Amino acid sequence: LPICQMAIGHNRYSTAGSDSVLDAQPVSAKYSLGEISIVHNGNLINKHEVRERLIEDGAIFQSNMDTENILHLIAKSKKENLQDRIIEALEQIVGAYCLLILSRSKMFVVRDPYGIRPLSIGRLKDGGYIVASETCAFDLVGATYVRDVAPGEMIVFEEGKSAFKSIELFEAKDPRLCAFEYIYFARPDSM
């Protein structure tokens, strides 16, 4: 994407799929509304059904990762704006996910309705924001913890705006944070 005030830094421990460079994230593409990049932490349990439906509709996949399913769902949507396309795509997937979707001027952050994977927002000293699955990432850039993204919530950051917008996409379910987050995946200095 062109130079802007937003960026993606992503390091994911793959628990499913291949370790091929084709399955590295972010996944980026040009589509009818412009350019987007997506990173995803989690697993979609209906990924095979969604992929088969997309292939039947003419989608061509470049990887084996379930993140690409989300990209195709967004790209094929007929909704007028990216936010509505993301919402429509999320209504078709089932599983554990934290997503960050970056366009030219907006960044969308979404957490699944069960809150299976952690996702937090931090504030940089210059007023900018950082989003990470582990709060120890904030320490590395001098950011302070603001809050967690709630289960079922979408956060929208817009270039040039100092505040972010919160949208309750899905009613939060009984929280089901993955036990492995704190005993295996996460660093001990993360909240």
PLM regions and their residue ranges:
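Conserved short alpha-helical segments that host acidic/polar catalytic motifs at enzyme active sites
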Residues: 1-151, 156-191
